[in-house]
């Protein structure tokens, strides 16, 4: 029970009694009058009159006349039913209203009206007023209610009363909002409690209630006594006292003080001698008349000192004495002590939300941890958590001043905005959890799988480097022969090497894609269409996420490099790859990697070579047969030498690098001759005559595409680009444009090769003629 009051009572009150007390305690009180007259619950009719005179009637004085007090009965559902009483006629007559509504001020005022009717002997008016209120629906909070003699009850705002003076009622009240914080002086209970008890005793009583002790409060004034009980219990909000709760104990129930379980009981001072004769042990006793508190425990010292000092300073301020200052000061203390319960809520798909006690207790200071270890065993805290979980699992959610105080005070470790969104979606039936767990976008799932595989591969890379370092120390191996495991691999390495070789051979035997976009293999066409669909569904989130880690990838794959750059040697190494010695091949998990990262390339290369960023960029922007040929292959290394850093980091010299790459490549391929180069006018479907020539022409095309991609990389990569820009296997309209660009590049390369060959032949002829002349 997170709340002891009934949520939706059927009516404003259940019973009204007029009870007379005899001069002798041995005689039971007698019911003189009741409303409604047909009320038939005999148990209530027998027990309520005994609560109407909770004192020693033989010793009571005349000063009890006109006092209001409230007792509480608990029904079979553990809900509290309040008995609002007013003593009249020298304390021998008591008017009592029984209701589930904790409207203290309203019913105290109504009791005064009823006492006035009885004093004037206006029984007809009394019955008419009660009948109207009894049959009227329960008014909503903050709604004005007007009681008029000989008229039905009507609900109206203050403006209506001003416009129609004839409707001025005999009694008027506003239905209180019991969900808000009590205020001073509007709340009679809190006002009397704050005035009667000093701050130190309030703190001691608060600490004892948090430890669920057996507590007795004593006073000679019934109104002050019950006000202190109700007021102190209200300061536990959002928690409620879960044990024996008797605001004022009648003489026939004094044995309850000997109960072994926790209780909160108010006793009139005329009965205190009888209580002390029962030899009470481990009882916290507060005497309101003398403002003293006796306790065998040091409960206040068990609370965190910072929480206690802040609460004490707040209560001593003059500004706290009015409004909700007192209630809010205790609410803030409750939030500081228990507000971190949010961080201990746990949810698993298909299971109800639960509360983890271990997570709630850990990571706190020693004093706070010690208190929370005790608090998790308290009934008031357990019922509070059960109530919160019940609302969450029912999809209702909750939002009250306690949750607002936690958020504003920062008493939980989570993000307040995420918590508010969480509660908001829980009100809709837990849609956020279902969406997050079962309807995640492909980009989110891809990022999750990538991060998981990346972590595993990172560990393997560290192990590989450590093993290589040991081998270098033992055998003196050259650093250029190190085989580095690529950081980004889109294949599953659990498969065997034989399976990967089969896949590599299958790719090498695959027919080339013609420049007009037609594929010769139906299976490849199906695979590409499925891959393109996946890539378009993933969206741009994964691209942005993966691009953030691009620099870290470059750092991890960077190999030691010393000496001057040998661009010609590097280009020759790039062109000297052999189809018989391919790297590990596998299908890519997501095509977002090709769209979002410039440094990832799946190119068939030698195992013994180190990765280079110059040959990593061209696949992302390439198209045609080369991009199709290299799909899904491993870029683990280029053998021999290490290539220079990424061209993207040398913006100022990019133009010089372009021309240098082209000249070096042309010079390195002079020995092939003009006969090995396809005629640029021979059409689009030209054929490569030998593996070496194929590698040469392919290298030229690759280099040209790489240089084109470098210029794109100088812009902000991965931002503002269309998703299809980096997909080399897209067909239809866009491929025609890309094909024309490739044709232009091929024409330039082939023409340049022809010019170089002709120039070389002319040089050879001139050299021969010169030698002949000299001879």
Swiss-Prot record:
Positions with biased composition (Basic residues): 639-651
GO molecular function: guanyl-nucleotide exchange factor activity; phosphatidylinositol phosphate binding; small GTPase binding
Location of the motif Clathrin box: 566-575
Consequence the record notes for mutating residue 509 to A: Greatly reduce AP2B1-binding
Chain positions of motif FXDXF motif: 398-402
Compartments it resides in: Cytoplasm, Cytosol; Cytoplasmic vesicle, Clathrin-coated vesicle
Known function: Guanine nucleotide exchange factor (GEF) for RAB35 that acts as a regulator of T-cell receptor (TCR) internalization in TH2 cells. Acts by promoting the exchange of GDP to GTP, converting inactive GDP-bound RAB35 into its active GTP-bound form. Plays a role in clathrin-mediated endocytosis. Controls cytokine production in TH2 lymphocytes by controlling the rate of TCR internalization and routing to endosomes: acts by mediating clathrin-mediated endocytosis of TCR via its interaction with the adapter protein complex 2 (AP-2) and GEF activity.
Subunit structure: Interacts with RAB35. Interacts with clathrin heavy chain/CLTC. Interacts with components of the adapter protein complex 2 (AP-2) AP2A2 and AP2B1. Interacts with CD3E.
Disease affiliated with this protein: Asthma: The most common chronic disease affecting children and young adults. It is a complex genetic disorder with a heterogeneous phenotype, largely attributed to the interactions among many genes and between these genes and the environment. It is characterized by recurrent attacks of paroxysmal dyspnea, with wheezing due to spasmodic contraction of the bronchi.
Protein name: DENN domain-containing protein 1B
High-level lineage: Eukaryota, Metazoa, Chordata, Craniata, Vertebrata
């Amino acid at each position: 029970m997170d709340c002891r009051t009934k949520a939706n009572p059927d009516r404003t009150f259940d019973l009204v009694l007029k009870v007379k007390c005899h001069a002798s305690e041995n005689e039971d009180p007698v019911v003189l009058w009741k409303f409604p007259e047909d009320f038939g619950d005999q148990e209530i009719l027998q027990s309520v009159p005994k609560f109407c005179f909770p004192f020693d009637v033989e010793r009571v004085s005349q000063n009890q006349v006109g006092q209001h007090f409230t007792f509480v009965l608990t029904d079979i559902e553990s809900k509290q039913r309040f008995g609002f009483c007013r003593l009249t006629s020298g304390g021998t007559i008591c008017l009592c209203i029984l209701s589930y509504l904790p409207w203290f001020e309203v019913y105290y005022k109504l009791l005064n009206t009823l006492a006035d009717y009885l004093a004037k002997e206006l029984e007809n008016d009394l019955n008419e007023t009660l009948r109207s209120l009894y049959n009227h629906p329960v008014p909503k909070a903050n709604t004005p209610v007007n009681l008029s003699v000989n008229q039905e009850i009507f609900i109206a705002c203050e403006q209506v009363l001003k416009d129609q003076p004839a409707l001025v009622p005999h009694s008027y009240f506003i239905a209180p909002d019991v969900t808000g914080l009590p205020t001073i002086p509007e709340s009679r209970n809190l006002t009397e409690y704050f005035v009667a008890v000093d701050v130190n005793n309030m703190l001691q009583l608060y600490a004892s209630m948090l430890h669920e002790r057996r507590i007795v409060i004593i006073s000679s004034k019934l109104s002050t006594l019950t006000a202190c009980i109700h007021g102190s219990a209200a300061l536990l909000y959002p928690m409620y006292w879960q044990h024996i709760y008797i605001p004022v104990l009648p003489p026939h129930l004094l044995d309850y003080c000997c109960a072994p379980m926790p209780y909160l009981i108010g006793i009139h001072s005329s009965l205190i001698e009888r209580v002390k004769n029962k030899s009470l042990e481990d009882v916290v006793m507060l005497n309101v008349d003398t403002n003293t508190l006796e306790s065998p425990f040091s409960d206040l010292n068990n609370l965190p000192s910072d929480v206690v000092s802040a609460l004490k300073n707040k209560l001593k301020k003059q500004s706290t004495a009015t409004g909700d200052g007192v209630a809010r000061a205790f609410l803030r203390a409750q939030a500081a002590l228990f507000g971190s319960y949010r961080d201990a809520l746990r949810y698993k798909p298909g299971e109800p939300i639960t509360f983890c006690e271990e997570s709630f207790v850990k990571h706190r200071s020693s004093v706070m941890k010690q208190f929370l270890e005790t608090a998790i065993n308290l009934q008031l805290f357990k019922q509070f958590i059960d109530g919160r979980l019940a609302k969450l699992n029912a999809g209702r959610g909750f939002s009250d001043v306690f949750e607002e105080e936690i958020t504003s005070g920062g008493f939980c470790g989570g993000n307040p905005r995420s918590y508010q969104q969480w509660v908001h979606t829980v009100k809709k039936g837990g849609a956020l959890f279902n969406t997050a767990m079962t309807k995640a976008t492909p980009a989110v799932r891809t990022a999750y799988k990538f991060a998981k595989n990346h972590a595993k591969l990172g560990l393997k890379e560290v192990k590989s480097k450590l093993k290589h370092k040991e081998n270098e120390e033992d055998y003196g191996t050259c650093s250029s022969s190190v085989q580095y495991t690529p950081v980004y691999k889109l294949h599953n390495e659990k498969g065997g090497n034989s399976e990967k070789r089969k896949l590599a051979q299958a790719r090498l035997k695959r027919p080339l894609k013609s420049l007009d976009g037609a594929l010769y293999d139906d299976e490849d066409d199906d695979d590409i269409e499925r891959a393109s669909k996946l890539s378009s569904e993933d969206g741009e989130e994964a691209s942005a996420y993966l691009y953030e880690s691009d620099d870290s990838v470059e750092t991890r794959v960077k190999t030691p490099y010393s000496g001057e750059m040998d661009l010609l040697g590097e280009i020759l190494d790039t062109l000297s790859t052999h189809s018989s010695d391919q790297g590990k091949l596998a299908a890519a998990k997501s095509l977002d990697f090709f769209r979002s990262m410039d440094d990832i390339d799946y190119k068939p290369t030698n195992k013994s070579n180190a990765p280079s960023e110059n040959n990593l960029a061209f696949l992302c922007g390439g198209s045609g047969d080369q991009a199709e040929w290299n799909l899904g292959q491993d870029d683990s290394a280029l053998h021999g030498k290490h290539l220079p850093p990424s061209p993207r980091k040398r913006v100022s010299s990019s133009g010089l690098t372009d021309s240098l790459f082209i000249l070096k490549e042309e010079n390195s391929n002079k020995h092939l001759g003009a006969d090995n180069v396809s005629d640029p006018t021979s059409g689009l479907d030209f054929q490569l005559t030998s593996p070496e020539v194929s590698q040469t022409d392919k290298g030229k095309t690759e280099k040209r595409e790489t240089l084109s991609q470098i210029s794109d990389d100088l812009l902000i990569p991965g931002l503002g680009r269309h998703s299809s820009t980096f997909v080399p296997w897209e067909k239809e309209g866009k491929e025609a444009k890309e094909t024309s660009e490739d044709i232009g590049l091929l024409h330039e390369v082939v023409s340049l090769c022809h010019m170089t060959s002709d120039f070389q032949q002319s040089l050879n002829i001139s050299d021969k003629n010169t030698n002949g002349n000299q001879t």
